[in-house]
Curated annotation (Swiss-Prot):
Subcellular location: Secreted, Extracellular space, Extracellular matrix; Secreted, Cell wall
Species, as recorded: Coprinopsis cinerea (Inky cap fungus)
Effect of residue 45 to A: Abolishes chitooligosaccharide binding
Keywords annotated in UniProt: Cell wall, Extracellular matrix, Fruiting body, Lectin, Secreted
GO cellular component terms, A-Z: extracellular region
Pfam families: Gal-bind_lectin
Effect of residue 138 to A: Abolishes chitooligosaccharide binding
The protein, known as: Galectin-3
Length: 164
């Protein structure tokens, strides 16, 4: 299934993500220069999130250009964030003008790929299936991606050739 996800919005998936599902966020722009305006938070942060039916953020992927970091976390609904896990941002996207973030939902972890190359495995902290995705930015900042992302949900069983 394909969905359009606008900056500062949340979209319901057509159905909850099934076991071994894959979500691909695609942009037609990449700007890795830090946002000139840090706004009230003081942190250059754009993020995409996988959210369950209860409103828990199962996986938060923050792009913090000024800190040269991808930040991974989980956020139980109405509670504080857990400890951040980080990897360097520099060099992950290469020269691509159509960047993508792909998340493969394994039973115990998320495999995170940037431009279809695995960069991190994030151990699941919260239960539930992804039913929504969001694309957010801190107030007053410019995003590294286009204002609209394409979101594709797929499964290996549907894309792998099968022998007869």
């Amino acid at each position: 299934m394909f969905h359009i996800l606008r900056l500062e919005s949340t979209v319901d998936l057509s159905e909850p993500l099934k076991d071994n599902g894959i979500i691909v966020f695609q942009s037609d722009k990449l700007d890795l220069e830090p946002s000139p305006n840090l706004g009230p938070t003081g942190i250059d942060n754009t993020n995409v999130n996988l959210i369950n039916a209860k409103g828990d953020v199962l996986l938060h992927i923050g792009i913090r250009r000024r800190e040269n970091a991808f930040v991974f976390n989980s956020i139980p609904y109405g509670e504080s964030r857990g400890p951040e896990e980080r990897i360097p941002l520099e060099g992950t996207f290469g020269d691509r003008r159509d960047p993508s973030i792909t998340i493969f939902d394994h039973p115990d972890r998320y495999q995170i790929m940037i431009d279809y190359k695995t960069v991190y495995y994030y151990k699941k902290r919260l239960e539930g299936r992804c039913e929504k995705v969001s694309y957010k930015i801190n107030e007053g900042q410019t995003p590294p991606f286009s204002d609209v992302l394409g979101v594709t949900v797929l499964y290996f069983a549907n894309v792998m050739p099968r022998a007869n």
